[in-house]
């Protein structure tokens, strides 16, 4: 179905070009700021108050954001970020000094059908050999071909610059254009975030817990459990013909909301808030865009802190039971950090830079097998780790080759540590050897360095002068104690 001409007039004034001026730190050398960069995407007004929807990846590193509405001229308008939801790749921004009279109408992405005609709308950037060519607003017609991992799949090309733009169906926005797969057999496969995902993100309307930049980072719930697929014959045997479909719980993580629900490993989950669960962990009868959906995709239907009912068969009590749980956002320890909104801490000691492990480090070091394995294991992402992001040349760690970049620090002064807070506590308890204070730093592989604190601080002063990074409170304490000079005389 073509877009009505009356709707097109609204679209031309409500779909905006977003210019994001971004900064990032060097995640191996966090005292250095990377060169500013400028990116472009698309967004669209959703109300008369100046709220604009777009993708999180368009603006999540932006220090400054501007929009342009080419149909109304070349003037730029300042924007601020209201929230980002990295898991959904959704961001809401708001104009500071402009309110649009035009905005689009949001549809219902739950009611979509395969084969429906859609329109991808945005400001694509054409990539040439020498420069990027910024195009005017472009309409691309396509067809809904299904869903993958909870995203709407279309045969429409989503080019650079289109990200964050609206996906229209029946004159309403039913998705946010997100990405395109490329390859010999993958061209013209685009994905969009269902618009209903935005509708469940109502945290920003009533929350008062904003950080210092007044930007809300919305995390999402996860049941944090593992299960085994089953067969009807198996379930009939172990439940004496009481259950024919469901999944057997094999593990429940300590951080899971299921931990206090009464559900235990061995129990059989059959229903999540009215959605029957099949033997392979998909919705039994409910289909979206022609296919059953996984439990994780099903959770995308619910709001943060919403209460849902889970029905299960208690294998020990041999009876059907139900429990209500609250879908609380999960605080993953290994996650993406955004320096524009969040303080990023690091600690330099003994010629090494130590940081709390983040997803930013994993992205930067894609070929590291140990880091990659963490990115593939949700249970491992719930654990804090202290990572070595850099080892300075000529430091004892570098000379001895005992501790290397991307190693994990497990003990400091024989005290177990897994984050910077633990490191600070351990540093207050130096080892005493022959009446001298020492510091010992040990990896999870048992490799360590052991140095007198005085030598450690003297070396760090030299590194600080050479590599131009600030000394920390640990250094300042011992500089004063030992009467050391902070000027490098070499």
Each model region followed by its residue ranges:
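Catalytic-histidine neighborhood of serine endopeptidases
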Residues: 47-90, 95-100, 112-113, 118-123, ...
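PDZ domains, with a preference for the canonical peptide-binding region formed by the helix
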Residues: 271-309, 411-444
């Amino acid at each position: 179905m073509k877009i009505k001409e009356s709707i097109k007039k609204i679209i031309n004034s409500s779909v905006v070009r977003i210019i994001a001026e971004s900064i990032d730190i060097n995640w191996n050398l966090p005292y250095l700021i990377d060169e500013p960069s400028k990116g472009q995407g698309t967004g669209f007004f959703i109300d008369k108050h100046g709220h604009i929807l777009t993708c999180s990846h368009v603006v999540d590193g932006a220090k400054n954001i501007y929009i342009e509405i080419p149909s109304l001229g070349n003037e730029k308008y300042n924007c601020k970020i209201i929230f980002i939801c990295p898991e959904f790749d959704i961001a809401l921004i708001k104009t500071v000094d402009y309110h649009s009279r035009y905005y689009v109408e949001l549809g219902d992405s739950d009611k979509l059908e395969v084969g429906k005609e859609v329109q991808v709308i945005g400001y694509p950037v054409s990539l040439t050999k020498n420069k990027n060519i910024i195009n005017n607003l472009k309409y691309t017609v396509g067809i809904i071909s299904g869903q993958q991992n909870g995203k709407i799949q279309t045969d429409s090309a989503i080019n650079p610059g289109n990200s964050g733009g609206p996906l229209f169906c029946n004159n309403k926005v039913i998705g946010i254009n997100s990405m395109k797969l490329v390859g010999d057999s993958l061209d013209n496969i685009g994905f969009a975030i269902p618009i209903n995902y935005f509708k469940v993100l109502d945290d920003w309307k009533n929350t008062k817990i904003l950080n210092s930049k007044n930007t809300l980072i919305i995390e999402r719930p996860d049941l944090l459990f593992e299960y085994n697929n089953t067969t009807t014959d198996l379930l009939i045997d172990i439940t004496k013909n009481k259950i024919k479909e469901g999944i057997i719980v094999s593990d429940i993580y300590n951080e899971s909301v299921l931990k206090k629900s009464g559900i235990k490993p061995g129990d059989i989950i059959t229903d999540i808030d009215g959605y029957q669960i099949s033997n392979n962990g998909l919705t039994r009868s409910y289909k979206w865009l022609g296919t059953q959906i996984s439990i994780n995709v099903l959770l995308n239907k619910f709001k943060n802190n919403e209460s849902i009912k889970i029905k299960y068969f208690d294998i020990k009590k041999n009876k059907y039971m139900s429990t209500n749980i609250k879908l609380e956002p999960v605080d993953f320890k290994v996650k993406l950090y955004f320096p524009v909104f969040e303080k990023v801490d690091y600690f330099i000691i003994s010629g090494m830079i130590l940081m709390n492990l983040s997803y930013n480090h994993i992205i930067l070091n894609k070929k590291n097998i140990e880091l990659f394995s963490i990115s593939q294991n949700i249970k491992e992402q719930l654990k804090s780790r202290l990572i070595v992001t850099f080892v300075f040349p000529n430091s004892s760690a570098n000379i001895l080759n005992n501790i290397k970049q991307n190693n994990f620090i497990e003990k400091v002064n024989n005290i177990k540590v897994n984050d910077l807070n633990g490191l600070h506590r351990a540093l207050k308890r130096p080892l005493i050897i022959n009446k001298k204070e020492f510091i010992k730093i040990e990896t999870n592989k048992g490799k360590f360095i052991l140095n007198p604190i005085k030598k450690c601080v003297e070396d760090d002063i030299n590194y600080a002068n050479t590599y131009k990074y600030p000394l920390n409170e640990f250094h300042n304490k011992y500089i004063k104690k030992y009467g050391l000079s902070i000027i490098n005389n070499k």
